[in-house]
Amino acid sequence: MTATLQQRKSANVWEQFCEWITSTNNRLYIGWFGVLMIPTLLAATTCFIIAFIAAPPVDIDGIREPVAGSLIYGNNIISGAVVPSSNAIGLHFYPIWEAASLDEWLYNGGPYQLVIFHFLTGVFCYLGREWELSYRLGMRPWICLAFSAPVAAATAVFLIYPIGQGSFSDGMPLGISGTFNFMIVFQAEHNILMHPFHMLGVAGVFGGSLFSAMHGSLVTSSLVRETTENESQNYGYKFGQEEETYNIVAAHGYFGRLIFQYASFNNSRQLHFFLAAWPVIGIWFTALGVSTMAFNLNGFNFNQSIIDSQGRVINTWADIINRANLGMEVMHERNAHNFPLDLAAGEVAPVALTAPAING
């Protein structure tokens, strides 16, 4: 008697699905993180496009003064945005089913929460997917570590800052001029330009751009000649070739003489680690700075630091910045505040306790 064992079809289908999901032979790697990444990013993108084009005005400050952000309501690509959810909602989770009607959900800025939560979930999964693909291919895991810098920055402005300030209405609007408005108000309320972590972020971004340009120009200037004058130098490289396509010794010698010897890397691995680490660490610091300023641990305050022998203030650039901050602060959300915080926080002015006698 012969016995045959046959696997259940459902288990076989599941195994095939798992194999397909984790296969590195697919044109685009999916992975288990991709199973969550794809629908969340599609949802965020779809809602963003629809809201940017057609969303009705949103009562962002919670004072019944809706702000229009969509193209249909008169904006252009520069001025348009998905407006953050209402200050009346605060930090409450506000999905569609929490609103009494779709009109109410739109009026209170529900699409903003839908977009940022799906977007953040999607980019977290994209980071995980980078690690997953590196793992499958036997690569080192530093690609996802580099991507963690922009992920941290997005998390800071869309999630940590609203949590610290107590309302998603303080999150960054999803648009060009909305981003600039966020930056201006952030400076007015937190003096971010005087925060050391923001300074490190500026050094990271500008320094990274400089180093990238320096590296690219040095490599391009020291290519090994493989072509004639009549054809593109790009034809001198064949994908997968074993030989170096540029002369690192020549590049090292040039740059070492241009600056000084030890300003130039003589190790290609150290060089490329430096090119990756510099901007990543800078952006990490900026994200950390925004996350601390979310809880009002603000930039340095050097206002009225210098006074003369008579006690009069000698203005410095810090005082000029402070004056600009006050101007920006009193102008933003101008109908939501009776007394802007900085102006209302001064010392109490003495007043007369009794009315003066009036003769006559």
Curated annotation (Swiss-Prot):
Q: How does it sit in the membrane?
A: Multi-pass membrane protein
Query: What's the Enzyme Commission number for this chain?
Result: 1.10.3.9
Q: Which residues bind chlorophyll a PD1?
A: H198
Positions that bind Fe cation = H215, H272
Which InterPro entries does its entry note?
D1/D2, Photo_II_D1/D2_sf, Photo_RC_L/M, Photo_RC_L/M_CS, PSII_D1
Record-level GO cellular component terms: photosystem II; plasma membrane-derived thylakoid membrane
* Family matches, as Gene3D superfamilies: Photosystem II protein D1-like
Chemical reaction(s) catalysed: 2 a plastoquinone + 4 hnu + 2 H2O = 2 a plastoquinol + O2
Q: Where does a quinone bind?
A: H215, S264, F265
Against CDD domains, the record matches this protein to: Photosystem-II_D1
**What binding details are noted for the cofactor?**
The D1/D2 heterodimer binds P680, chlorophylls that are the primary electron donor of PSII, and subsequent electron acceptors. It shares a non-heme iron and each subunit binds pheophytin, quinone, additional chlorophylls, carotenoids and lipids. D1 provides most of the ligands for the Mn4-Ca-O5 cluster of the oxygen-evolving complex (OEC). There is also a Cl(-1) ion associated with D1 and D2, which is required for oxygen evolution. The PSII complex binds additional chlorophylls, carotenoids and specific lipids.
The UniProt record gives the binding positions of [CaMn4O5] cluster as D170, E189, H332, E333, D342, A344
Q: Which GO terms describe its molecular function?
A: chlorophyll binding; electron transporter, transferring electrons within the cyclic electron transport pathway of photosynthesis activity; iron ion binding; oxidoreductase activity, acting on diphenols and related substances as donors, oxygen as acceptor; oxygen evolving activity
Q: Where is this site: Tyrosine radical intermediate?
A: Y161
For this UniProt entry, what is the primary localization, expressed as one broad class?
Answer: membrane
**Which keywords has UniProt assigned to this entry?**
Calcium, Chlorophyll, Chromophore, Electron transport, Herbicide resistance, Iron, Magnesium, Manganese, Membrane, Metal-binding, Oxidoreductase, Photosynthesis, Photosystem II, Thylakoid, Transmembrane, Transmembrane helix, Transport
The compartments listed are:
Cellular thylakoid membrane
Q: Which Pfam families match?
A: Photo_RC
Which residues are propeptide?
Answer: 345-360
Q: Where is this site: Stabilizes free radical intermediate?
A: H190
Transmembrane segment boundaries: 29-46, 118-133, 142-156, 197-218, 274-288
Q: Which family does it belong to?
A: Belongs to the reaction center PufL/M/PsbA/D family.
Protein name per Swiss-Prot or TrEMBL:
Photosystem II protein D1 2
Q: Which organism is it from?
A: Trichormus variabilis (strain ATCC 29413 / PCC 7937) (Anabaena variabilis)
Gene responsible for this protein: psbA2
